[in-house]
From Swiss-Prot:
This is 3-dehydroquinate dehydratase. It catalyses: 3-dehydroquinate = 3-dehydroshikimate + H2O. Catalyzes a trans-dehydration via an enolate intermediate. Homododecamer. The record marks 17 as: Transition state stabilizer. Belongs to the type-II 3-dehydroquinase family. It comes from the Bacteria. GO terms for biological process: amino acid biosynthetic process; aromatic amino acid family biosynthetic process; chorismate biosynthetic process; quinate catabolic process. It comes from Roseiflexus castenholzii (strain DSM 13941 / HLO8). The gene is aroQ.
C-alpha cells in the first residue's frame, strides 16, 4: 500500500507559525510520526511540502497514479488552488483533506474549499492527529481496490 501525504504552503513553518492556532509540533515531527505508523503496518508513505502549487501538482502526477490513498493539507490552496484540485480529481485514490485548525471557526474566507468536492472526506480541527486519523481510515479501505473514492463519492462506476 502506498499513501501520499501532501503539505501545502506555509506548513513548513509549523511549530513557529501561530502556535496558538496550529500547535507547537513541527512538520518534521508530524512526518516522523506518520512514517512510524506507516512502517508499523508495512505501508509506503511519501511526503512532500511545497509553497508552490505547481510543485505539488508535479508530485501528484509523478506518484499519484498508483497511490492507494492521498492525505492533503492544502493550506491556503484550499481556497483557490483550482489546478491542484484538478490534479487530484484525475486520480483514483481516496483523498482525505486535513486541516490542523477548525477552519469553520475562523475567518469566513477559510470556510470554502475547492478541494472538498473531489475529496472523499475532510478532517479539521484535530491538530496533527488528523493526519493519523486519515491514515487509519485509509488502512481501513485496504483491499477494496481502485475506485474506492469514486464509489464513496458516487460519481463513477
Amino acid at each position: 500500500m502506498k499513501i501520499l501525504v501532501i503539505h501545502g504552503p506555509n506548513l513548513n513553518m509549523l511549530g513557529r507559525r501561530e502556535p496558538e492556532v496550529y500547535g507547537s509540533v513541527t512538520l518534521d515531527e508530524i512526518n516522523a510520526i506518520l512514517q512510524e505508523r506507516a512502517a508499523a503496518v508495512g505501508v509506503t508513505l511519501l511526503t512532500v511540502q511545497s509553497n508552490h502549487e505547481g510543485a505539488l501538482i508535479d508530485f501528484l502526477q509523478a506518484e499519484g497514479w498508483d497511490a492507494d490513498g492521498i492525505i492533503i493539507n492544502p493550506g491556503a490552496l484550499t481556497h483557490y488552488g483550482l489546478a491542484l484540485r484538478d490534479a487530484l480529481a484525475m486520480l483514483k485514490a481516496p483523498i482525505i483533506e486535513v486541516h490542523l485548525s477548525n477552519v469553520y471557526r475562523r475567518e469566513p474566507f477559510r470556510h470554502t474549499s475547492v478541494i472538498a468536492p473531489v475529496a472523499t472526506g475532510q478532517i479539521a480541527g484535530l491538530g496533527w492527529r488528523g493526519y493519523l486519523l486519515a491514515i487509519e481510515w485509509l488502512l481501513g479501505t485496504r483491499g477494496q481496490g481502485p475506485g474506492t473514492r469514486d464509489q464513496a463519492l458516487g460519481t463513477r462506476d
